[in-house]
């Protein structure tokens, strides 16, 4: 007990001489040597690693064009939403790798990653993307199956007699 008092007294003396300065963490921009902005997006079990750079609007997903990777046009329109909101269609080239999950989860992960990378490239886009709901991660995941039940919430049939 006396050792603790001595240690706290030493700390207080040290703080009296030099008060603590607040450590401010500045956000580090993830930019590589070729000027690409990097961000990760997540949705369900899918994780997308996204790099964007100023270009002509070319989008590559897992070494395929976006039309080859997502045959449905609605998926492509959803992925292009950040560019539509910020009015930057055909101004950025996007390269992304996606792993895990299904097609819908991968679409959401790419959308989230592109939004975060656009936010890093031009900080003025932050409010636009935030209001559009594109910067928040959708945390809904599949609920686990419980033992003694058929599914996550479905129970076995109840028999009164």
Swiss-Prot record:
It comes from the Bacteria. The keyword Ribonucleoprotein applies. One of its GO terms (biological process) is translation. PROSITE patterns: RIBOSOMAL_S9. Pfam families: Ribosomal_S9. The keyword Ribosomal protein applies. Keywords: Ribonucleoprotein, Ribosomal protein. HAMAP family: Ribosomal_uS9_B. NCBIfam families: PRK00132.1. Belongs to the universal ribosomal protein uS9 family. This is Small ribosomal subunit protein uS9. It comes from Rickettsia akari (strain Hartford).
């Amino acid at each position: 007990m006396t050792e603790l008092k001595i240690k706290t007294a030493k700390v207080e003396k040290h703080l009296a001489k030099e008060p603590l300065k607040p450590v401010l963490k500045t956000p580090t921009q993830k930019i590589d040597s070729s000027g690409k902005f990097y961000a990760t997006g997540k949705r369900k079990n899918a994780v997308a690693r996204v790099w964007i750079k100023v270009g002509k609007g070319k989008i590559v997903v897992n070494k395929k064009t976006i039309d080859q990777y997502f045959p449905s046009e609605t998926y492509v329109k959803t992925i292009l939403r950040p560019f539509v909101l910020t009015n930057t269609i055909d101004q950025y080239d996007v390269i992304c790798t996606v792993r895990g999950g299904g097609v819908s989860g991968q679409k959401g992960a790419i959308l989230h990653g592109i939004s975060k990378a656009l936010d890093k490239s031009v900080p003025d886009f932050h409010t636009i993307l935030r209001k559009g709901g594109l910067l928040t991660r959708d945390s809904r995941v599949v609920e686990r199956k419980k033992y003694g039940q058929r599914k996550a919430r479905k129970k076995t049939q109840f028999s009164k007699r």
